Each structure stands twice: as structure tokens, then as C-alpha cells.
Amino acid sequence: RADRSSRQVLRDAGLAAAACCLLGAAFAWLPGAWSATVWPYALVYALLVIVHAGVRLGRKTYLVDMAGQDRRALYVALSNSVTGAMLLLVGSVTGVLGQWLGTTWLLVVLAFMALAAAASAARLPEVES
């Protein structure tokens, strides 16, 4: 699917990440037997791993299709570096928010961030020819 529209893959992955975060947050309100076991959270984590692979595929495919042959390696290297720096920054902020808000509300905040990412991806121009 990324060969047809990497922009749509990015959008759909953002929506799926938001759904996973909201599902994980909702587990806190399940009856004790469900929220006391690790399995519902393990399922959400497994789904998030799949969604993360979609985000990575969509991002790299979008960059490769957008860049010309002579700039492709530069764009991918820059994208990887910026992504790594953003992960460090957002990871630090997420840790602080997790201490302040608690896990459930942190997942809600992350869901809104994923929705914002999906909206941003939906506004990207198509680059596939």
C-alpha cells in the first residue's frame, strides 16, 4: 500500500496509533479482573509495534519518493537524525508528563498527538508518480 500512497499509510498509522492509545487508556476503567492482568496491555503493545512499523515504512517511502536520485541519501540520513533527536526530546517530555498525569491520561495525550500527526499527514501532497 505504501507504493500507492505513503501519505495515506502515514495517516492511517497515526489513526491506528491513536486508537491503540485510547484503547490502552480505556483498560484502566475495565473491571478489576481485566485491568489487573497484563494481557490486554500486551495486546495493545503488540498492535502499537505493528503500527510503528507502518509509520517507519510510510515515512521512508514518502522521503524516497519525494527526493530526487541525487538527494535521496541526504534526505533519508537527515530524516533519521531528526527523528532520533525528536524521540529523545519527546521521550523526555513524555516521561515528565507520565509522572505528572499518570499513565491513563498520558495515553490520552499521546492519542491526541497521534491524531495531530494523522491530520498533518493527510495534508501532505502526494509524491507517488
Language-model-detected regions and their locations in the chain:
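Helix-to-loop junctions at the C-terminal end of transmembrane segments
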Residues: 1-11, 98
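A membrane-interface helix-boundary motif in multi-pass transporters
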Residues: 37, 96-114
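C-terminal transmembrane helical hairpin of 12-TM major facilitator-type secondary transporters
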Residues: 8-55
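Intracellular juxtamembrane helix-capping segments at the cytosolic ends
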Residues: 54-67
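Loop-to-transmembrane helix entry/capping segments in MFS-fold secondary transporters
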Residues: 69-79
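Transmembrane alpha-helical cores of Major Facilitator Superfamily
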Residues: 15, 46, 77-85
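Multi-pass alpha-helical transporter architecture, strongest
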Residues: 24-28, 109-129
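A gly/Pro-rich, aromatic-decorated transmembrane alpha-helix motif that marks the paired
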Residues: 85-97
